[in-house]
């Protein structure tokens, strides 16, 4: 079991993207930073907002890339490379079209599933896809032509409340995730639904 050393929250930078569905991962990391009582600070050399806390004597770094979504890998690779963090010690939180709001699931490895942030991270890590993912359901608009506007839009309050609940569920299995106990984390998280 490899302990998590880096938790990444994907999103787009700038106030026009704040609270959009595509920024669900960034929202998770913001909530995690708040729960740990730490601030996220802009670090130009990592192309993102960075924070750090200690868990059982080990550093855990938080990162929200300030690149656009399709360049997220630039930020992840810069920080992971500097601190020599292997892909299997990275957790990436991101929005997931194929799950309804209120559902959060963990996954290890796999493809990008059409998600541009994941696509770039895989490419920038040298086609290594063994990192872990926290998939935060945002639902699907119904037709592929509507996806771009949907993910870049803000969810109605009822959907946002479901997303917030799924983030709470994910924060509830943080100890298992940090320890690298993915089986236990999945059992606990996947049994919950808002």
Curated annotation (Swiss-Prot):
CDD domains tied to this protein: PTH
GO biological process: protein quality control for misfolded or incompletely synthesized proteins; rescue of stalled ribosome
One GO cellular component term: cytoplasm
Keyword Metal-binding: no
The keyword Protein transport belongs to this UniProt entry's keyword annotation: no
Main location: cytoplasm
EC number: 3.1.1.29
Reactions the enzyme catalyzes: an N-acyl-L-alpha-aminoacyl-tRNA + H2O = an N-acyl-L-amino acid + a tRNA + H(+)
Disulfide bonds: none
Swiss-Prot/TrEMBL site (Stabilizes the basic form of H active site to accept a proton) positions: 95
Site annotation Discriminates between blocked and unblocked aminoacyl-tRNA: residues: 12
Protein location: Cytoplasm
SUPFAM superfamilies reported for this sequence: Peptidyl-tRNA hydrolase-like
GO molecular function terms attached to this record: peptidyl-tRNA hydrolase activity; tRNA binding
Keywords: Cytoplasm, Hydrolase, RNA-binding, tRNA-binding
Highest taxon above the source species: Bacteria
Active site: 22
Broadest EC class assigned to this enzyme: hydrolase
Binding site for tRNA: 17, 68, 70, 116
Family: Belongs to the PTH family.
Subunit structure: Monomer.
PANTHER family: PEPTIDYL-TRNA HYDROLASE
Name of the molecule in the record: Peptidyl-tRNA hydrolase
Organism: Pseudomonas paraeruginosa (strain DSM 24068 / PA7)
């Amino acid at each position: 079991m490899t302990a998590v050393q880096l938790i990444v929250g994907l999103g787009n930078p700038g106030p026009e993207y704040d609270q959009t569905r595509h920024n669900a991962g960034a929202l998770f990391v913001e909530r995690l930073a708040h729960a740990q009582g730490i601030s996220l600070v802009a670090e130009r050399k990592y192309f993102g907002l960075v924070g750090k806390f200690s868990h059982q004597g080990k550093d855990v770094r938080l990162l929200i890339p300030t690149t656009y979504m399709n360049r997220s890998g630039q930020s992840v690779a810069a920080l992971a490379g500097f601190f020599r963090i292997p892909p299997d010690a990275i957790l990436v939180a991101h929005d997931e079209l194929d799950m309804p709001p209120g559902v959060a699931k963990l996954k290890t490895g796999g493809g990008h599933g059409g998600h541009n942030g994941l696509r770039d991270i895989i490419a920038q890590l040298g086609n290594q896809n063994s990192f872990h993912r926290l998939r935060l359901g945002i639902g699907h608009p119904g037709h592929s032509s509507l996806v771009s506007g949907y993910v870049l839009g803000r969810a109605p309050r009822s959907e946002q409340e479901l997303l917030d609940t799924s983030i709470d569920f994910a924060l509830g299995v943080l100890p298992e995730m940090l320890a690298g106990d993915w089986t236990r984390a999945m059992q606990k998280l996947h049994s919950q639904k808002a």
